[in-house]
Design a protein with these regions (language model features):
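Bacterial N-terminal signal peptides
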Residues: 7-17
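A beta-strand edge to alpha-helix "cap/lid" segment located at domain peripheries
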Residues: 23-67, 74-170
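Positively charged n-region of N-terminal signal peptides that target proteins for export
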Residues: 1-5, 23
């Protein structure tokens, strides 16, 4: 009887250990993005435009953003997805105030007349009057029309890493 209990106990222990190991190894793969040391002129143009966009958002320059955002653009936040009109209204009203974005890495990929940017950022914002700082992987999609880049999609994906920005926004 003791042998049976010991074997059963060892079997259960082994099954639990394997189950825990399988759960831990099933974490989604992650790939760290790195800023290119020598971006192409076109990549640099889109990266610079994205950096300017963060400044415009922080300073609530809705007129400049209105020109940058494509009429069919979409914005995906932690709380929902909406179009250009709602995004501009949200910025103008202060519903979301993008106070400061610290970009740690950015990768730009050009596909003909389209560009996809991935940005590893910490975003300091006021949402509904509450100060928040979150780590995000931001995906921006731009399309080139008549020689000018237009923002077509902006998506915030919350990261599991800790915020790197200090309390002073650095």
């Amino acid at each position: 009887m003791k042998t049976f209990a010991l074997i059963t106990g060892l079997f259960l222990f082994t099954m639990i250990a394997q189950s825990l190991d399988a759960q831990q190894s099933q974490q989604p793969p992650t790939e760290t993005i790195k800023t290119a040391a020598n971006p192409t002129p076109e990549q640099k143009e889109v990266i610079d435009l994205s950096n300017t966009k963060w400044d415009w958002m922080a300073n609530k320059k809705v007129d400049s953003l209105e020109t940058l955002f494509d009429d069919k653009s979409m914005f995906t936040h932690m709380g929902g997805t909406w179009g250009k009109t709602q995004e501009l209204a949200t910025i103008k009203s202060g519903g979301i105030w993008y106070k400061k974005a610290v970009v740690y890495a950015v990768e730009a990929r050009i596909f003909g007349n389209a560009a996809i940017l991935l940005e590893d950022i910490d975003l300091q914002a006021a949402v509904g009057g509450h100060e928040v700082t979150n780590p995000f992987m931001v995906t921006e999609v731009y399309t080139k029309e008549n020689g000018k880049w237009k923002l077509a999609q902006l998506t915030f994906s919350h990261l599991l890493r800790a915020v790197k920005m200090d309390s002073k926004g650095n």
